[in-house]
């Protein structure tokens, strides 16, 4: 079955930088498979714009910072969502694709679906970890889910939601064997000697909560492992400026701050101390021993704890189905505990070999040529709609 030769229109929404990255990957795959005249529009970031995407609103208007911290953004987000729904119903695109940002996109997807516009969602929410009741909203809103992780389709199938496992684009991007020596050369680090990458997050609130603890842990580690060097990526000049007072307060640290290049910094390391998030999956794909940590405001933490199901939060542990790397969260994330755990990860060669095996198996499972698989799934949805037309 062939798609129509008249102009196709695909509406898309990405709500934060990670979604922009995924959506740009999907756009590249779609542009290889759909007519050149296809129009892509909605809400997106710089990576999507590089593919010719027409963004009607700034993506950063949708980027929120947790339950309590997001309250001030709600009125504008609701206004944008209302305008987007009206636009979709007026223009009736061939499909709507929501990329992550479920709290924003599910409502739009339900409106599209109710109007007969196919709704596709890219990135299954972590219903297997917390807020499992969202599966009911997914079943009402989503015609087809594109899943990053292999265990998700079975969960969705039980709720009657069609889905496709497409793998994770990071697994396609990152080589199976990281070039640690080359990364050290690129960053001007010594070829020999222990290196620990420290990643306290990329948001002001994250740095404020966990930054001082991470720096105190680094000071303890340097006392106990005098030859150790640290590398810390700063995603933006603003973040580097935010880190500077902490750097100034610890002049004894053998610390290299890099401008971005977080993947290079992690590749150069022997072990990693990292705030929980997608970056922990990146660290696993780089086959690095790590310690996962986070601190969030008390009320946000209470909400998360009451709605969670799994005993772990780090993606490497979730994918393995067990603790393969330590997690130190909230009040357990003390400088002493973080230093002890990170140095253990650095020094334990048997554990390093075991983790390399576990993470290699994980890498191979997630390496699926995500852009192609996701684009092919979208094309199938468009073809099915064409067949019903």
Swiss-Prot record:
Q: Does the keyword Metal-binding apply?
A: no
Which SUPFAM superfamilies is this protein grouped with? UDP-Glycosyltransferase/glycogen phosphorylase (SSF53756)
List the GO terms this entry assigns under cellular component, sorted alphabetically: membrane
Task: Tell me one GO molecular function of this protein.
Answer: phospholipid binding
Query: What is this enzyme's catalytic activity, as reactions?
Result: a lipid X + a UDP-2-N,3-O-bis[(3R)-3-hydroxyacyl]-alpha-D-glucosamine = a lipid A disaccharide + UDP + H(+)
Pathway-wise, it operates in: Bacterial outer membrane biogenesis; LPS lipid A biosynthesis
Q: Which GO terms describe its biological process?
A: lipid A biosynthetic process
What Pfam families does its record include?
LpxB
Q: Decide whether keyword Transcription regulation is in the record.
A: no
Give the record's keywords alphabetically.
Answer: Glycosyltransferase, Lipid A biosynthesis, Lipid biosynthesis, Lipid metabolism, Transferase
EC code: 2.4.1.182
Q: What does this protein do?
A: Condensation of UDP-2,3-diacylglucosamine and 2,3-diacylglucosamine-1-phosphate to form lipid A disaccharide, a precursor of lipid A, a phosphorylated glycolipid that anchors the lipopolysaccharide to the outer membrane of the cell.
UniProt record similarity statement = Belongs to the LpxB family.
The protein's matches in HAMAP family, at most eight in alphabetical order, are given as: LpxB
Q: What is this protein called?
A: Lipid-A-disaccharide synthase
């Amino acid at each position: 079955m062939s798609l129509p030769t008249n102009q196709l229109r695909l509406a898309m929404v990405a709500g934060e930088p990670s979604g922009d990255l995924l959506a740009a990957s999907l756009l590249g795959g779609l542009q290889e498979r759909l007519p050149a005249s296809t129009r892509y529009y909605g809400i997106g970031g710089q990576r999507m714009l590089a593919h010719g995407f027409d963004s009607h609103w700034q993506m950063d208007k949708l980027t929120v910072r947790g339950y309590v911290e997001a309250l001030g953004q709600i009125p504008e987000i609701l206004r944008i969502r209302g305008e987007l729904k009206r636009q979709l119903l007026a223009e009736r695109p061939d499909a709507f694709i929501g990329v992550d940002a479920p709290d924003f996109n599910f409502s739009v997807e339900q409106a599209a679906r109710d109007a007969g516009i196919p709704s596709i969602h890219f990135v299954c929410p972590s219903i297997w970890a917390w807020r499992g009741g969202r599966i009911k909203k997914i079943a009402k809103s989503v015609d087809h889910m594109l899943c990053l992780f292999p265990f998700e389709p079975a969960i969705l199938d039980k709720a009657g939601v069609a889905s496709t496992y497409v793998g994770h684009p990071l697994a396609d991007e990152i080589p199976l064997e990281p070039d640690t020596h080359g990364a050290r050369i690129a960053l001007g680090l010594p070829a020999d000697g222990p290196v620990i990458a420290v990643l306290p997050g990329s948001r002001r609130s994250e740095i404020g909560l966990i930054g001082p603890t991470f720096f105190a842990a680094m000071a303890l580690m340097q006392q106990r492992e005098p030859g150790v060097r640290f590398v810390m990526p700063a995603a933006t000049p603003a973040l580097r400026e935010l880190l500077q007072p902490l750097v100034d307060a610890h002049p004894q640290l053998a610390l290299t701050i890099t401008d971005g290049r977080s993947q290079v910094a992690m590749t150069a390391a022997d072990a990693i101390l990292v705030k929980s998030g997608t970056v922990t999956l990146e660290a696993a794909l780089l086959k690095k021993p790590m310690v996962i940590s986070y601190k969030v405001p008390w009320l946000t933490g209470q909400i998360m704890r009451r709605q969670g199901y799994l005993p772990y939060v780090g993606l490497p542990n979730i994918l393995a189905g067990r603790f393969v790397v330590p997690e130190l969260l909230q009040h357990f994330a003390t400088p002493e505990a973080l230093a002890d755990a990170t140095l253990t990860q650095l020094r334990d060669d048997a554990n390093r070999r075991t983790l390399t095996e576990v993470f290699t198996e994980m890498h191979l499972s997630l390496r699926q040529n995500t852009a192609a698989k996701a684009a092919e799934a979208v094309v199938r949805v468009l073809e099915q709609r064409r067949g019903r037309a």
